[in-house]
Design a protein with these regions (language model features):
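Helix-termination/interfacial motifs at the ends of transmembrane alpha-helices
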Residues: 16-95
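N-terminal alpha-helical segment
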Residues: 9, 30, 46, 102-106
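A short structural micro-motif
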Residues: 15-19, 112, 128-131
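Regular secondary-structure segments
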Residues: 1, 14, 48-51, 55, ...
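Short, non-transmembrane cytosolic segments of multipass membrane proteins
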Residues: 1-11, 24-29, 115-116
Length: 131
């Protein structure tokens, strides 16, 4: 705070919060991308498994088990996306929102102090973040 103008202080800290948020969202985007690619990789595994089944067309006894094994790759791909990757991405986004809100709360408090606002007013304004 140290004699800085409140508007300038808010501008600088808002830019810092934006950069902080963008950096944190990169990790979430990686998990989200993995959730998008995972089913595709599962389908590729299924196609490769079916190609392998085609090699055994002469033996009908092996067809059923071969097809079942081929589709396991699809189940793994869809399962990994919906049970692992996408929930991790959503959890990260929720945590990022909390961290950004904490920083915004800090900025409001610092700007209130820089403005010379009554401490009770600053406290009540910050309590609004917790409601």
């Amino acid at each position: 705070v140290d004699g800085a103008e409140p508007d300038r202080l808010r501008q600088v800290l808002d830019v810092e919060i934006g950069a902080y948020e963008a950096k944190l969202k990169l990790a979430s985007k990686i998990w989200e991308s993995a959730g998008g690619y995972s089913p595709t990789i599962g389908i590729i595994g299924a196609v490769m498994g079916l190609i392998h089944v085609m090699e055994n067309l002469a033996d009908p006894a092996k067809l059923g088990s071969g097809i079942a094994v081929a589709f396991v790759a699809t189940i793994y791909g869809v399962g990994a996306a919906n049970l692992i990757f996408l929930p991790i991405a959503k959890k990260l986004m929720a945590n990022i929102a909390i961290l950004v809100t904490q920083r915004e709360m800090l900025v409001d408090g610092l700007v209130g102090i820089a403005n010379g606002d009554n401490p009770r007013i600053v406290e009540s304004r910050l309590q609004g973040y917790l409601a």
